[in-house]
Amino acid sequence: MKETVTAPTDGFHQEESTLEVEKKKSQPFELEDSEYHLKACKVSTPEVQTTPVIFTSPHSGRNYFPQFLASSRLNKLDLRRSEDAFIDEVFKRVPENGAPLLCAKFPRAYVDVNREAFELDPTMFHDPLPNFVKTTSPRITAGLGTIAKIVTDGEEIYHAKISVKEALWR
Protein backbone atom coordinates (compact mmCIF):
# COMPACT_ATOMS: atom_id res chain seq x y z
CA MET A 1 0.00 0.00 0.00
CA LYS A 2 1.32 3.48 -0.86
CA GLU A 3 0.67 6.64 1.10
CA THR A 4 1.22 10.22 0.00
CA VAL A 5 2.96 12.51 2.48
CA THR A 6 3.07 16.28 1.97
CA ALA A 7 5.88 18.16 3.69
CA PRO A 8 7.27 21.70 3.55
CA THR A 9 10.42 22.04 1.48
CA ASP A 10 11.82 25.03 3.35
CA GLY A 11 11.62 26.81 6.68
CA PHE A 12 9.12 29.31 5.34
CA HIS A 13 6.59 26.60 4.38
CA GLN A 14 5.85 28.43 1.11
CA GLU A 15 6.26 25.40 -1.10
CA GLU A 16 5.32 21.83 -0.44
CA SER A 17 6.70 18.60 -1.76
CA THR A 18 4.72 15.40 -2.12
CA LEU A 19 6.45 12.12 -1.43
CA GLU A 20 5.12 8.66 -2.02
CA VAL A 21 6.17 6.22 0.67
CA GLU A 22 5.69 2.50 0.72
CA LYS A 23 3.64 1.51 3.75
CA LYS A 24 3.30 -2.07 4.89
CA LYS A 25 0.57 -3.15 7.29
CA SER A 26 1.66 -3.16 10.94
CA GLN A 27 5.07 -1.77 10.00
CA PRO A 28 6.27 1.70 10.98
CA PHE A 29 7.36 4.05 8.23
CA GLU A 30 9.74 6.95 8.69
CA LEU A 31 10.26 10.29 7.00
CA GLU A 32 13.92 10.97 6.27
CA ASP A 33 15.63 14.30 6.73
CA SER A 34 17.51 14.78 3.47
CA GLU A 35 20.37 16.97 4.75
CA TYR A 36 21.40 14.96 7.80
CA HIS A 37 20.05 11.58 6.69
CA LEU A 38 18.43 11.19 10.08
CA LYS A 39 14.85 10.07 10.31
CA ALA A 40 12.86 12.86 11.97
CA CYS A 41 9.78 10.93 13.03
CA LYS A 42 8.40 7.46 13.25
CA VAL A 43 4.76 6.64 12.54
CA SER A 44 3.52 3.22 13.60
CA THR A 45 0.08 2.28 12.36
CA PRO A 46 -2.19 -0.52 13.54
CA GLU A 47 -3.23 -3.30 11.23
CA VAL A 48 -6.81 -2.17 11.87
CA GLN A 49 -7.45 1.18 13.52
CA THR A 50 -10.12 0.71 16.20
CA THR A 51 -10.04 4.15 17.81
CA PRO A 52 -10.07 7.76 16.57
CA VAL A 53 -7.20 8.56 18.97
CA ILE A 54 -3.62 9.16 17.77
CA PHE A 55 -0.93 8.71 20.42
CA THR A 56 2.11 10.97 20.23
CA SER A 57 5.51 11.11 21.84
CA PRO A 58 6.85 14.53 20.79
CA HIS A 59 9.52 14.91 23.49
CA SER A 60 11.27 11.56 23.86
CA GLY A 61 13.53 11.72 20.80
CA ARG A 62 17.12 10.68 21.47
CA ASN A 63 18.83 11.34 18.11
CA TYR A 64 21.16 14.30 18.64
CA PHE A 65 22.72 15.90 15.55
CA PRO A 66 26.53 16.25 15.90
CA GLN A 67 26.19 19.91 14.82
CA PHE A 68 23.68 20.54 17.62
CA LEU A 69 25.92 18.91 20.23
CA ALA A 70 28.88 20.99 19.01
CA SER A 71 26.87 24.22 19.36
CA SER A 72 25.81 23.37 22.92
CA ARG A 73 27.52 24.40 26.15
CA LEU A 74 26.05 21.24 27.68
CA ASN A 75 26.92 17.61 27.24
CA LYS A 76 24.39 15.13 25.89
CA LEU A 77 23.38 13.90 29.35
CA ASP A 78 22.61 17.47 30.47
CA LEU A 79 20.60 18.11 27.28
CA ARG A 80 18.62 14.93 27.87
CA ARG A 81 17.11 16.46 31.03
CA SER A 82 14.58 18.17 28.75
CA GLU A 83 13.33 14.88 27.29
CA ASP A 84 10.25 12.99 28.34
CA ALA A 85 12.56 10.01 28.37
CA PHE A 86 11.27 6.70 27.05
CA ILE A 87 7.61 7.73 26.64
CA ASP A 88 7.95 6.28 23.13
CA GLU A 89 8.84 2.96 24.77
CA VAL A 90 5.88 3.20 27.17
CA PHE A 91 3.55 3.69 24.17
CA LYS A 92 5.25 1.25 21.78
CA ARG A 93 2.44 -1.34 21.93
CA VAL A 94 -0.30 1.17 21.18
CA PRO A 95 -0.53 0.12 17.47
CA GLU A 96 -1.10 -3.50 18.55
CA ASN A 97 -4.19 -2.19 20.34
CA GLY A 98 -5.68 -0.29 17.40
CA ALA A 99 -4.27 3.24 17.53
CA PRO A 100 -1.53 4.98 15.52
CA LEU A 101 1.61 6.24 17.26
CA LEU A 102 3.67 9.25 16.12
CA CYS A 103 7.11 9.67 17.73
CA ALA A 104 9.58 12.50 17.17
CA LYS A 105 13.11 11.09 16.96
CA PHE A 106 14.86 14.44 17.59
CA PRO A 107 15.06 15.92 21.10
CA ARG A 108 12.88 18.68 22.53
CA ALA A 109 16.04 20.73 23.19
CA TYR A 110 16.61 20.79 19.39
CA VAL A 111 13.06 21.85 18.45
CA ASP A 112 9.86 21.68 20.48
CA VAL A 113 7.01 20.58 18.24
CA ASN A 114 4.47 21.57 20.90
CA ARG A 115 5.12 25.25 20.24
CA GLU A 116 3.97 27.62 17.55
CA ALA A 117 6.12 27.05 14.47
CA PHE A 118 7.89 30.40 14.82
CA GLU A 119 7.86 31.17 18.55
CA LEU A 120 11.46 32.40 18.84
CA ASP A 121 13.49 34.47 21.31
CA PRO A 122 15.20 37.26 19.31
CA THR A 123 18.11 37.38 21.81
CA MET A 124 19.19 33.90 20.63
CA PHE A 125 19.99 34.98 17.07
CA HIS A 126 22.81 37.01 15.56
CA ASP A 127 20.63 38.28 12.70
CA PRO A 128 17.14 39.84 12.73
CA LEU A 129 14.11 37.57 12.75
CA PRO A 130 11.53 37.79 9.92
CA ASN A 131 8.36 39.77 10.67
CA PHE A 132 6.15 36.67 10.82
CA VAL A 133 8.02 35.30 13.86
CA LYS A 134 6.28 35.55 17.23
CA THR A 135 8.86 37.07 19.60
CA THR A 136 6.88 37.46 22.83
CA SER A 137 5.04 34.88 24.90
CA PRO A 138 5.34 33.46 28.41
CA ARG A 139 7.18 30.44 26.95
CA ILE A 140 9.72 32.63 25.14
CA THR A 141 10.25 34.66 28.32
CA ALA A 142 10.89 31.39 30.19
CA GLY A 143 13.48 30.36 27.56
CA LEU A 144 11.26 27.61 26.17
CA GLY A 145 10.25 28.75 22.69
CA THR A 146 10.18 26.58 19.58
CA ILE A 147 13.96 26.47 19.89
CA ALA A 148 14.72 26.38 23.59
CA LYS A 149 17.28 28.70 25.12
CA ILE A 150 17.55 26.61 28.29
CA VAL A 151 17.12 23.03 29.45
CA THR A 152 14.58 22.11 32.11
CA ASP A 153 16.68 23.22 35.10
CA GLY A 154 17.47 26.63 33.60
CA GLU A 155 20.96 26.06 32.17
CA GLU A 156 21.59 27.80 28.84
CA ILE A 157 22.02 25.46 25.89
CA TYR A 158 24.15 27.37 23.38
CA HIS A 159 27.76 28.64 23.36
CA ALA A 160 26.80 31.55 21.12
CA LYS A 161 23.91 32.98 19.15
CA ILE A 162 22.63 30.88 16.26
CA SER A 163 21.55 31.91 12.76
CA VAL A 164 17.98 32.56 11.73
CA LYS A 165 18.58 30.22 8.77
CA GLU A 166 19.32 27.39 11.23
CA ALA A 167 16.16 28.14 13.22
CA LEU A 168 13.96 28.20 10.12
CA TRP A 169 15.52 24.97 8.86
CA ARG A 170 14.64 23.20 12.10
Feature locations, PLM:
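N-terminal catalytic or cofactor-binding beta/alpha core of small enzyme domains
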Residues: 2-170
